[in-house]
Amino acid sequence: MFSFFGDESKLPASTVMVSRMTVKKQAVARQQSSGPMAGPSKPSNVTPKHSHGSLKGTPRSASEKGTPKQGPSSSSKSTSKVKQEERIRLSTIPRTPASSSSPGRLKRKTPKVQVVESESSSGSESSDGALDSKPKRPKVTRKETGIDMTPLPGEEVVGRRVFCWDKVDMRGEWGRGWAGFVGCDEVVRGNVQGWANGGGGDGSKNLGKYRAFFPQEGFDRDGDFLPSVEVLYPAKGCREKFVLMVPSSDREFNPIGELRNTLRLILEHYIPPSHRHIFGTLAESLDISNPLSSLPSRMTTPLPNSLVTPPPDPASPSPAFAFEISATSTPAPSTERQETIADLIRKSLAPNRRDGPLFVTAIERYNSAMQAIQEDGTLQQWLDEGMNGGKGIKVREWAALVDFVHDQAYSRVVGGYSHELEHHPKHPEEVSKAISGKEDAYGELRHAFMSKIIEQTKLGPDSVFVDLGSGVGNCVLQASLQAGSRSYGFELLPVPAHCARLQVREVQRRWAMWALKGNLDVEVHEGDFRVHKEVGRRLREADVVLVNNEVFPSSLNMDLADMFLDLKEGAKIVSLKPFVPEGFRMNESNCDSFAAILRSTQHDYYRDWVSWKGEWGNYYVAVIDRSRRIKFEESMKGRASRRR
């Protein structure tokens, strides 16, 4: 019976997988000098004229007809037959059996003959291509080392210091330590005090938007009393009071959710390995390193003080194992997992438990353990030496930490202005003439969008970032911390500009609370960026310029093009509308336009990357490249000289 791979009754027992397919003629007598095949077959560029279906009737050469047949032994006959059947099977290209193959099909050009290698061969590639009749480009094999292998997007390391635990006290407010940040309880009460006074809250009306989370007595609001706990941040002596209540609406600030994420990120990034058995982890997804996981994994790396192989049954230990344990000076690690602080937090917050007293106990244990590693220098030593200042943290993890810290600041000083931002006053009269009414809608680029811009433009500590139309300052602050760049923003509307100033102060205090190293050279300005005195100077320094011009009128985009003529060579412009017209080709009539010095590429942004719509869209990255225009001018001069 014929199958896809040939005659099944004649197949050998063992299976050999191949990474390339080949077509070979029937073996001729080994004595022939015209076609010896000593040793393993070698690659050839010769395409065989016949397929495997015609191997049965392959005629012998003329010289072979006159040669008397020699009588091979039965073993050599068997070996020759097995080799012939092996070649027939390995040379299969998906098609019908040979008996039905037409001569026209047999004359088709076939791929180059390659060396047939088994799956166990060290040089073999994946056998997935064995069923594909199309020739494939050979894969470039890289050295299997962590240095030479290209990491996946987001898996690269940051490569710079992002933690500065020893410098956080330098950023308190007027020497008062940690009195300068807006607390969680102020947001819940809607009564922001101090330098951020007038945060747009409703005072006592805000409390009606919250309800108790824990059902036990003493965990509900009683007049002005709000159930709360104090949590210690990584910075020494920095505590924040979190209200143990939840909002009735998803649009409101959620203190319980923020508290849980605060603890999760601290346990994930700040706890030394020597103390992780005390703190534990609050990872949202399945943690393969968590001993509670019932799923075994090859990716789990044992800790240095753990057993490489699982211990035997304690009820009947083997004599050899018992001898090894008694011979060592340190006791064997316990097979019973101790309950960590994270376990208590997870249990107390479980929807089917909501155990308030247990949660308070867990937070007390956490504060005591965190204070201990702060005071004895363990935490600082781990951040400075163990993590090398955070140089080894992955880009994806670093971006998530930045996103959360900045979201804390946004919730405290910008969230209260949400109504004013959605219904902000119109533009000043002198500006409204140049801007259409549809542009009078406030919108923000989300964190994921700015992370992509940082990656594409390669923003770094030596870069200068300028945001024209910076809103509440989200992108400016993200570039200053996530990329470490000097960042400057310019916003026309008064309400977003005021929120930006508040957010800069709150964000920098949050950096200190989390012991993060951001670039403190951040400025946000209010005014028309076309006439602001600082814009020209910052544009001449800029490496990356961001402008959300999706709804700008053509007149404003023309003004921007004139301003961008001062950008230095290699500077990048990120915009939501292109500055190079579609199908633009340089000629004598347009060689003096701004588009003539740009190299522009189009990219996609995804759903929820912008605040004003939930759909995907396009954005553009243009690079200042004056060499194209210079070459065009030289070619024009050459043509003019030839005409003379």
Swiss-Prot record:
Catalytic activity: L-lysyl(79)-[histone H3] + 3 S-adenosyl-L-methionine = N(6),N(6),N(6)-trimethyl-L-lysyl(79)-[histone H3] + 3 S-adenosyl-L-homocysteine + 3 H(+)
Main location as per UniProt: nucleus
Biased composition (Basic and acidic residues): 131-146
Residue positions binding S-adenosyl-L-methionine: 442-445, 465-474, 491, 528-529
Subcellular location: Nucleus
Residues making up the signal peptide according to the UniProt record: none
Function as written in the Swiss-Prot or TrEMBL entry: Histone methyltransferase that specifically trimethylates histone H3 to form H3K79me3. This methylation is required for telomere silencing and for the pachytene checkpoint during the meiotic cell cycle by allowing the recruitment of RAD9 to double strand breaks. Nucleosomes are preferred as substrate compared to free histone.
Protein name (record): Histone-lysine N-methyltransferase, H3 lysine-79 specific
Source lineage: Eukaryota, Fungi, Dikarya, Basidiomycota, Agaricomycotina
Protein encoded by which gene: DOT1
